From Swiss-Prot:
Gene transcribed to yield this protein: ESR2
PANTHER family, sorted: KNIRPS-RELATED PROTEIN-RELATED (PTHR48092)
Listed InterPro entries: ER-beta-like_N, ER-beta/gamma, Est_rcpt/est-rel_rcp, NHR-like_dom_sf, Nucl_hrmn_rcpt_lig-bd, Nuclear_hormone_rcpt_NR3, Nuclear_hrmn_rcpt, Znf_hrmn_rcpt
Source organism: Coturnix japonica (Japanese quail)
Protein name: Estrogen receptor beta
Pfam family, one: ERbeta_N
């Protein structure tokens, strides 16, 4: 009595134990196969054989072994397609003991389930690409558009995952090819043709973005800047009496928190993420302290004699005396804030000026490998300038005064740069004297300032790729 026929377990036995030439396949209809599943077969393999199990007509005795008699005649090629097709597509599932024929997902390097949309891909990446091309696909990378996409981190950034799908050659037309030309595509995939189509797609997408940016009205651009504004950051006020270490610790913690929000703010400026990664990083490295300072001035504009570093950190001039060398910087910040107050700086003007500081900080050679990025940057600067001119014109003052006001606002930017340089020197001095420890993004920005003249390419801090740090 055989409760588990070898035929059901994919073993071939001879009809006569002494005659190996007359081997035949035997199969049992016993349901005991469901009671005691062989341990060496995967659940996916058993699932593939389920249809054959239910197709039998249980007319034989309980334990009698009889030749395999399928209800429908199935050829070898049909079985091969069924085993390797939609029901059990994975090469690993069809033969658990061998990885020789295994294919890997071109996007995340997981085991591929089949040839989808023109490339080998897993079920997860296939479904993600299908959702992206059929519906929502306006993803934004919260880091620097170079997130690592692998089996464990493929869900961390949708924008970089979709970009990699296009880079490896996934395309809409691939959905039909995988059904009708599977074997031909498997043997004769033309990678150069796929890359060429991807390049054409990227070029077309770039042209569309440029057209959309050029058609954005100044009002729409300013509204986008308004929506991109980062939230207020809270930091604990040091307890009195203030010391040099406690004061600098509070200021550096605040700066590090604001830097994280600044990266998200920059990426929301229309057209910024279309610049090369090199230019994006260099712009942020060059102006981060200027952006922080003009934000401080805007928060302090209605509080004469006070510097509103944060809602819970308000300092006056005398409280800066405890830190060596910072009093001069406090005086510069208070003087510029007073000048903005005299000009009655409006919120929309402040938004445009802050964006202009970021985009006009290119006091370095831009990426020679990507001249298009340089052209995009100049175009983006023109868009910001037009927005500032529009905001001033909307104030209703005479045209001659509009020109004078624009000049007055732009002239203050050089003073902001000067205060930023002073602040950078002071912060580096405090760091070298070990007055206060510096970590994370703030340390990266300081190192970039120190090594700017010695390196050829920007260095990105690991935090730039941590999606959890950037709320875009």
């Amino acid at each position: 009595m055989a409760f588990c026929s070898p035929a059901m377990m994919n073993y071939n036995i001879a009809s006569n134990f002494g005659d190996s030439e007359s081997a035949s396949v035997r199969q049992t209809s016993s349901p005991s196969l469901l009671w005691s599943a062989p341990g060496h077969l995967s659940p996916l393999t058993l699932h593939c054989q389920l249809s054959l199990l239910y197709a039998e007509q249980p007319k034989s005795p309980w334990c009698e072994a009889r030749p395999l008699e399928p209800v429908l005649p199935v050829s070898r090629e049909t079985l091969k397609r069924k085993t390797n097709g939609s029901d059990c597509t994975s090469p690993i599932a069809s033969n658990p003991g061998s990885k020789r024929d295994a294919h890997f997902c071109a996007v995340c390097s997981d085991y591929a389930s089949g040839y989808h949309y023109g490339v080998w891909s897993c079920e997860g990446c296939k479904a993600f690409f299908k959702r992206s091309i059929q519906g929502h696909n306006d993803y934004i990378c919260p880091a620097t558009n170079q997130c690592t996409i692998d089996k464990n981190r493929r869900k961390s950034c949708q924008a970089c995952r979709l970009r990699k799908c296009y880079e490896v050659g996934m395309m809409k037309c691939g959905s039909r090819r995988e059904r009708c030309g599977y074997r031909i595509l498997r043997r004769h995939r033309n990678s150069e043709d796929c890359m060429g189509k991807t390049k054409k797609y990227n070029e077309a997408a770039t042209r569309v973005k440029e057209i959309l940016l050029s058609t954005v009205s100044p009002e729409q651009f300013v509204l986008t800047l308004l929506e991109a504004e980062p939230p207020n950051v809270l930091v604990s006020r040091p307890s009195k009496p203030f010391t040099e270490a406690s004061m600098m610790m509070s200021l550096t913690k605040l700066a590090d928190k604001e830097l994280v929000h600044m990266i998200g703010w920059a990426k929301k400026i229309p057209g910024f993420i279309d610049l090369s990664l090199y230019d994006q990083v260099r712009l942020l490295e060059s102006c981060w302290l200027e952006v922080l300072m003009i934000g401080l001035m805007w928060r302090s504009i209605d509080h004469p004699g006070k510097l509103i570093f944060a809602p819970d950190l308000v300092l006056d001039r005398d409280e800066g005396k405890c830190v060596e060398g910072i009093l001069e910087i406090f005086d510069m910040l208070l003087a510029m804030t007073s000048r903005f107050r005299e000009l009655k700086l409006q919120h929309k003007e402040y938004l445009c000026v802050k964006a202009m500081i970021l985009l006009n900080s290119s006091m370095f050679p831009l990426s020679a490998e990507e001249p298009e990025s340089n052209r995009k940057l100049h175009h983006l600067l023109n868009v910001v300038t037009d927005a500032l001119v529009w905001v001033i014109a909307k104030s209703g003052i005479p045209s001659q005064q509009q020109t004078t006001r624009l000049a007055n606002l732009l002239m203050l930017l050089s003073h902001v740069r000067h205060a930023s340089n002073k602040g950078m020197e002071h912060l580096l001095s405090m760091k070298c004297k070990n007055v206060v420890p510096v970590y994370d993004l703030l340390l990266e920005m300081l190192n970039a300032h120190t090594l700017r003249g010695q390196r050829k390419s920007p260095v990105t801090h690991p935090d730039f790729e941590q999606v959890s740090h950037f709320q875009v």
